[in-house]
Amino acid sequence: MSNKQSRVPFGAALLGILTLLLLFETGAFAQTQVKDPLKLCKDVPAYQELKTQRLEAAQKAQADGKPVTFNEAGTKQKFERYDTAYCGQDGYPHLITSGQLDRAGDFLIPSVLFLWIAGALGWAGRLYLAESKGPEDEIIIDLPKAIKCLLLGLIWPVQAIPELISGKIRVPEDRVTISPR
């Protein structure tokens, strides 16, 4: 495969990502398009009622000596965090996925962390298979090699970008194994 052919999918992917970023609607615009826009939870009456009910239930359970997930202080702390979230008319917090940076802790940070961990595990598996001596290493795991690959997998973006640009990330068809059916 020539170097020019390997750059075509990368260029198309980059163009697609840039197009999505340019066409991405902001949260402010999305808020004007809904029937009942979200409000801060502390300003929603249904949320206040729910908060009162849960605090009273936590107090009662703690007084009765029942096991609870959150004691009264933990429940108060949970609802203090929810006070800054956005709620609908139902009183329940909603997850904001519009890309607003002030809500990055709700969705953006966990999703990027998930993708990074998934990429690290995939890259570690790829490294392990590349360094394996055959099917024996796949059946009986070589633990020192696996740990080394897992640690190297943590910096997978640094390793993946040069391979993606150079085209080394693609494996020839004859090296792709097909599992028995």
UniProtKB/Swiss-Prot annotation:
The chain crosses the membrane at residues 104-124. It comes from the Bacteria. Belongs to the PsaF family. The G.violaceus PSI reaction center is composed of one copy each of PsaA,B,C,D,E,F,L,M and Z, and forms trimeric complexes. Probably participates in efficiency of electron transfer from plastocyanin to P700 (or cytochrome c553 in algae and cyanobacteria). This plastocyanin-docking protein contributes to the specific association of plastocyanin with PSI. GO terms for biological process: photosynthesis. GO terms for cellular component: photosystem I reaction center; plasma membrane. It is found in: Cell inner membrane. This is Photosystem I reaction center subunit III. InterPro entries: PSI_PsaF, PSI_PsaF_sf. Keywords: Cell inner membrane, Cell membrane, Membrane, Photosynthesis, Photosystem I, Signal, Transmembrane, Transmembrane helix. Pfam families: PSI_PsaF. Residues 1-30 form the signal peptide.
